[in-house]
């Protein structure tokens, strides 16, 4: 099984799972640009950077799955996703969880609480800038309907 996961926002990265080995490539280290954002460069540059990243870890651009951690639930997301579909060779795709949902899971599962409300607020993500979740040990964090 070969899986590639991309995040194209600030501090972009690519993660590759290749038959039991996980490799993470921080693209700002590859490009030399602090806080590099793959989503803010042309499709040609995206292709070149992804090719360079995969060459660095000696992995072919041929994957069973692409985990798209960037473009769903965002304005103009469909266009950006189509660009990446033409760069990454994959058989199926799934969408990564929301930015704030990841914050909520990180906070809740490290807490001592059995039940909790979690507020996540920052500069933004693919799921907004301010989210509220409720959590139990059985369900984990779930979006609280307002």
Question: What residues fall within each predicted segment?
Answer:
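Short acidic/glycine-rich loops and adjacent helix/strand connectors
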Residues: 1-146
């Amino acid at each position: 099984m070969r899986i590639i996961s991309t995040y194209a926002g600030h501090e972009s990265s690519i993660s590759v799972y290749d038959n039991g080995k996980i490799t993470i490539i921080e693209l700002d280290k590859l490009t030399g640009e602090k806080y590099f954002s793959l989503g803010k460069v042309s499709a040609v540059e995206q292709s070149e950077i992804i090719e360079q990243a995969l060459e660095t870890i000696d992995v072919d651009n041929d994957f069973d799955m692409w985990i798209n951690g960037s473009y769903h639930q965002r304005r103009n997301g469909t266009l950006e996703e189509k660009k990446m579909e033409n760069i990454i060779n994959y058989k199926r795709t799934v969408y990564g969880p929301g930015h704030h949902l990841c914050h909520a899971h990180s906070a809740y599962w490290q807490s001592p609480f059995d039940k909790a409300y979690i507020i996540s607020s920052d500069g933004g993500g693919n799921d907004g800038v301010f989210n509220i979740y409720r959590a139990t040990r059985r369900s984990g964090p779930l979006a609280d309907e307002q």
